[in-house]
Amino acid sequence: MTATLERRESASLWERFCTWITSTENRLYIGWFGVLMIPTLLTATSVFIIAFVAAPPVDIDGIREPVAGSLLYGNNIISGAIIPSSAAIGIHFYPIWEAASLDEWLYNGGPYQLIVLHFLLGVSCYIGREWELSYRLGMRPWISVAFTAPVAAAAAVFLVYPIGQGSFSDGMPLGISGTFNFMLVFQAEHNILMHPFHQLGVAGVFGGSLFSAMHGSLVTSSLIRETTENESANNGYKFGQEEETYNIVAAHGYFGRLIFQYASFNNSRSLHFFLGLWPVVGIWFTAMSVSTMAFNLNGFNFNQSVVDSQGRVINTWADILNRANLGMEVMHERNAHNFPLDLASSNSLPVSLVAPSVNG
């Protein structure tokens, strides 16, 4: 009797790497999108921390008046920010090797572009990674679709808006007070509060918060008890169990009596589809509002739209908002010679009819 033994060739290093990358047994799934996501997000995070702590002032307006944003230059957690790239750079791609020196790159706000572009690439890969893991587990792809909403919003304020305005200096600063400054200036220049897409976005965010609170409270109030009265209801459930953990019929009946019958869902799939759809569509509209206003397709202007029989203006909320916008825009302009267009375009008013005499 003859036994034949065949020696099985060991898998190549590349094949083992591919198997490990795409394995769903890893504690954290990596995936092919993760191969790009991990280094880009690590780069963005590392540069952000270093720049937030120690970056020198940046000439954001391109007028040789640098603005300090880091902690070592006198800021705190609230006032600190990564200052956007200089207006002198515009929307040019500005990597380190395009500058004459590292000092010049820092002075012109190079870290902002580095952080933003790596961040956007990283979170885009995170979308792909969500889809990839869902695909390998046999799940449907809607998790990745939902995550496109915040990514679209980030791309709108960090990339689309600077492109539309012609300079990365118009992008949103990476900091708390910088975000608020961006919001105020955006309102002053584009009247975002009167843009219908932004209004839909507000409805999406606040409505999503309301629906989330309603759903969570209804579920936790209608749990199916699997334990005795002397034991916590939480002990009656196992992670991944097939049985329902709450009684949707009871929740539906409660809410139907609280509001009216057709205000509640009696189908779990349609309920959760609605809970996912509402905020996602709202944030999509918010991203579209910023993207359209990037090219100066601004909010509605109803200024001085109500007049009396004598032609005198009756101020409405739109006029009050317009006055606030003008005030914010004036405060924003750091150049005395660079007035906002809507202030500089009207006829000049004489403030002195006689030149003052200067003695001595």
Curated annotation (Swiss-Prot):
It catalyses: 2 a plastoquinone + 4 hnu + 2 H2O = 2 a plastoquinol + O2. A quinone binds at residues 215, 264-265. Belongs to the reaction center PufL/M/PsbA/D family. Chlorophyll a ChlzD1 binds at residue 118. The lineage of its organism: Eukaryota, Rhodophyta, Florideophyceae, Rhodymeniophycidae, Gracilariales. Residues 345-360 form a propeptide. Chlorophyll a PD1 binds at residue 198. It comes from Gracilaria tenuistipitata var. liui. The record marks 161 as: Tyrosine radical intermediate. The chain crosses the membrane at residues 29-46, 118-133, 142-156, 197-218, 274-288. InterPro entries: D1/D2, Photo_II_D1/D2_sf, Photo_RC_L/M, Photo_RC_L/M_CS, PSII_D1. The record marks 344-345 as: Cleavage. Tyr-161 forms a radical intermediate that is referred to as redox-active TyrZ, YZ or Y-Z. C-terminally processed by CTPA; processing is essential to allow assembly of the oxygen-evolving complex and thus photosynthetic growth. The D1/D2 heterodimer binds P680, chlorophylls that are the primary electron donor of PSII, and subsequent electron acceptors. It shares a non-heme iron and each subunit binds pheophytin, quinone, additional chlorophylls, carotenoids and lipids. D1 provides most of the ligands for the Mn4-Ca-O5 cluster of the oxygen-evolving complex (OEC). There is also a Cl(-1) ion associated with D1 and D2, which is required for oxygen evolution. The PSII complex binds additional chlorophylls, carotenoids and specific lipids. This is Photosystem II protein D1. The gene is psbA. The keyword Chloroplast applies. GO terms for molecular function: chlorophyll binding; electron transporter, transferring electrons within the cyclic electron transport pathway of photosynthesis activity; iron ion binding; oxidoreductase activity, acting on diphenols and related substances as donors, oxygen as acceptor. [CaMn4O5] cluster binds at residues 170, 189, 332-333, 342, 344. It is an enzyme of class 1 (oxidoreductase). 2 of the reaction center chlorophylls (ChlD1 and ChlD2) are entirely coordinated by water. Its EC number is 1.10.3.9. One of its GO terms (cellular component) is photosystem II. Pheophytin a binds at residue 126. Disulfide bonds: none annotated. It comes from the Eukaryota.
